[in-house]
Curated annotation (Swiss-Prot):
SUPFAM superfamilies in UniProt: Translational machinery components
Name listed for the protein in its UniProt record: Small ribosomal subunit protein uS11m
GO biological process: mitochondrial translation; translation
Superkingdom: Eukaryota
Keywords: Mitochondrion, Ribonucleoprotein, Ribosomal protein, Transit peptide
Family designation: Belongs to the universal ribosomal protein uS11 family.
Molecular function terms, GO-annotated: structural constituent of ribosome
Description of how the protein assembles with itself and partners: Component of the mitochondrial small ribosomal subunit (mt-SSU). Mature yeast 74S mitochondrial ribosomes consist of a small (37S) and a large (54S) subunit. The 37S small subunit contains a 15S ribosomal RNA (15S mt-rRNA) and 34 different proteins. The 54S large subunit contains a 21S rRNA (21S mt-rRNA) and 46 different proteins.
DNA damage listed as a keyword: no
Protein task: Component of the mitochondrial ribosome (mitoribosome), a dedicated translation machinery responsible for the synthesis of mitochondrial genome-encoded proteins, including at least some of the essential transmembrane subunits of the mitochondrial respiratory chain. The mitoribosomes are attached to the mitochondrial inner membrane and translation products are cotranslationally integrated into the membrane.
Miscellaneous remark of the record: Present with 5300 molecules/cell in log phase SD medium.
Length: 217
């Protein structure tokens, strides 16, 4: 159950009261609840732009200029998460704002962090469940192979082969071998031509708590 904070003096106390529904007309001591509707949002993104008050830039001669983002796709990244129970594929675009340096009050660190790690926009997200596989079937080779083929079809349909593609793989489930087979096969013939880099993002364990005993049949 979602909870809301209670305001007492100048300190946020422990969450105690349940929050109302998002379309409720109730208020919190005169302050109305506000929720942003993202159901119609096309892209999932981590890009944040200046607010409307900071979007007006003042030049040295006294004239003002409205800041307008000018985004350009640098490359695409195809992420693959291959667990023992499922396969998740995400295709995202790395975008660069050509007018980012025009932000008001931008520090040197802000500029360096932005260009060192450019933001990404998720374009396509698929898993084996999206193709109708259920329960234990989601972790099988065939499910991952069909999901990979469907991902390559969507990339081609949406005309996202105009930039280089980087492939990032994570974990070592059955879907990893299926994804590679589909990529180098006829299913990924149009995509593999644009792949310029393949990397592994599997996390390595150093110490930590003891892992569960491996299941053997």
């Amino acid at each position: 159950m979602l909870l809301q904070p209670v305001w007492k003096g100048c300190r946020w106390t422990q969450f105690v009261r349940p929050i109302r529904r998002w379309n409720s007309t109730g208020t919190n001591r005169g302050v109305p609840f506000s929720f942003k509707d993202i159901s119609n949002q096309e892209d999932i993104t981590n890009i944040s732009y200046p607010s409307s008050s900071d979007s007006v830039l003042t030049k040295s001669n006294g004239s003002s200029e409205v800041y307008k983002p000018k985004e350009e796709v640098v490359k695409y990244i195809l992420h693959g998460k291959f667990t023992k129970n499922n396969t998740h594929l995400t295709f995202s675009s790395v975008v660069e704002d050509k007018n980012f340096h025009k932000n008001k009050g931008l520090t040197y660190n802000d500029t360096m962090l932005y260009y060192l790690n450019l933001p990404q926009k998720v374009k396509i997200s698929l898993s084996t469940g999206c193709l109708g596989f259920r329960k234990a079937a989601r972790g099988e080779y065939e499910a991952a192979f069909q999901t990979s083929g469907r991902m390559f079809e969507l990339i081609k349909e949406k005309n996202m082969l105009n930039k280089d593609i980087e492939v990032v793989m994570d974990d070592f489930g059955k879907g990893r071998a299926a994804f590679i087979s589909a990529l180098v096969g006829k299913e990924g013939a149009s995509v593999v031509k644009k792949v310029v880099k393949i990397s592994d993002a599997t996390k390595l364990k150093f110490g930590g708590v003891r892992s569960p005993k491996m299941r053997r049949l």
